[in-house]
């Protein structure tokens, strides 16, 4: 453990935002992140796998538009503002998370990716500490994982302006702010649960 700490150096404090606001249409609109799935021998709700993998968060924020009482036992809950019809998409949830973030860095994770390796986020934090980049995004050597990212609070005005113009594409916003990719060799880690078969 000491050797690992020395290798990583001093990592910046961060808050964790788990995105749980989707409709889960392929899962009968059940609240996906609360559904149990077995990972590494542990059968627990997806969100609990995620929180466990992202160890060290100063604050845990959950973007959710339903089942908010269930989420409150795990962290602070933010919902899409009333001015947004339906669900505003992940960018709206990210903006609401940035508004209440208790640290200078916000780690963003989708609530349906329970296979993340323990402390997977250290690579993002280390890059932020070394280079001071405002937006870092995980890349699995195949494609950019747009919603597995580390954001500096300074990007909030840019994101708000982007959303107010009616834009909702995370990929497009990341391109406009010059996001930097951080490579991960493990591609299966970012697998997201979409239907009943994935739960087994």
Over which residues does each language-model region extend?
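Nucleotide and nucleotide-moiety/phosphate-recognizing core
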Residues: 4-167, 172-191, 196-197
């Amino acid at each position: 453990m000491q050797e690992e700490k020395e290798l990583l150096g001093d990592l910046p404090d961060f808050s964790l935002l788990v995105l749980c606001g989707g409709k889960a249409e392929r899962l009968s609109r059940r609240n996906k992140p609360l559904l149990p799935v077995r990972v590494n021998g542990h059968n627990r709700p997806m969100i609990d796998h995620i929180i466990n993998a992202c160890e060290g968060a100063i604050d845990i924020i959950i973007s959710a538009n339903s089942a908010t009482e269930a989420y409150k036992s795990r962290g602070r809950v933010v919902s899409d503002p009333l001015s947004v019809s339906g669900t505003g998409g992940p960018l709206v949830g990210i903006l609401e998370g940035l508004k209440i973030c208790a640290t200078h860095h916000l780690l963003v994770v989708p609530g349906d990716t329970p296979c993340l390796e323990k402390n997977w986020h250290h690579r993002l934090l280390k890059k932020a500490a070394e280079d001071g980049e405002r937006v870092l995004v995980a890349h699995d050597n195949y494609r950019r994982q747009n919603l597995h990212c580390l954001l500096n609070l300074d990007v909030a005005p840019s994101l708000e302006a982007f959303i107010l113009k009616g834009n909702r594409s995370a990929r497009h916003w990341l391109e406009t702010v010059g996001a930097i990719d951080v490579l991960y060799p493990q591609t299966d880690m970012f697998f997201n649960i979409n239907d009943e078969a994935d739960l087994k």
